[in-house]
Amino acid sequence: MGIAPDDSTTVTPEKAEDLVRYRLAVGDIVLGRKGEVDKSALVNERSDGYVCGSDAMALRPRLGTVPEYLWWFLQSSGAHSQLEFWSVGATVSGLNQTAIRKVRLPLPDVQEQRRVASYLIEKTEKIDTLIAETERFIELSKERRSALITAAVTGQIDVRKMV
């Protein structure tokens, strides 16, 4: 959901002042401008003040739009379809301001937006936990499998009576 900084592409404080109009604020949403146009990140306190690079574009939600709700919408298949449809470029998909303005956002009242965002955070955290536990189980199972094979082929386990 957040932004991972790339220290290899930093700018000097002086240059950052020249780029003040591209400075990100908490609640902004950063989208990839080229290629994978369906990727986005929500600017949090840690990335507040970063400068948006030229291969990305920042959306600043309007008053009445909950940033987390907008970010979750951008994760949806409906948003992905619209972004792909309105993107430009024959070889590499690209987004511009015109394409973004054409995307239709279902916009309930602010309280409902907050409820939707909270619900999705709660449910996806549970799913992410289950995925992590499953991945850990798979890794342990692979280790167990490897140890079992090693033990069987080195004679540490007598398999003659098991087959």
Model-predicted regions and their roles:
Residues 1, 23-39, 51-56, 71-84:
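Short Ser/Thr-interspersed hydrophobic loop/turn segments at strand-loop and sheet-helix junctions
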Residues 1-29, 45:
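Sequence-specific dsDNA recognition surfaces
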Residues 13, 58-60:
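Short histidine-centered catalytic/ligand-binding loop motif
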Residues 36, 49-57, 65, 88-114:
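A short glycine-rich beta-alpha junction/loop motif
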Residues 42:
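A short, polar/charged loop-to-alpha-helix boundary motif
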Residues 46, 61-64, 77-78:
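Short loop segments at secondary-structure junctions
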Residues 66-73, 119:
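Short amphipathic alpha-helical coupling segments at ligand-binding clamshell hinges
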Residues 102, 107-163:
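Amphipathic alpha-helical coiled-coil/heptad-repeat segments
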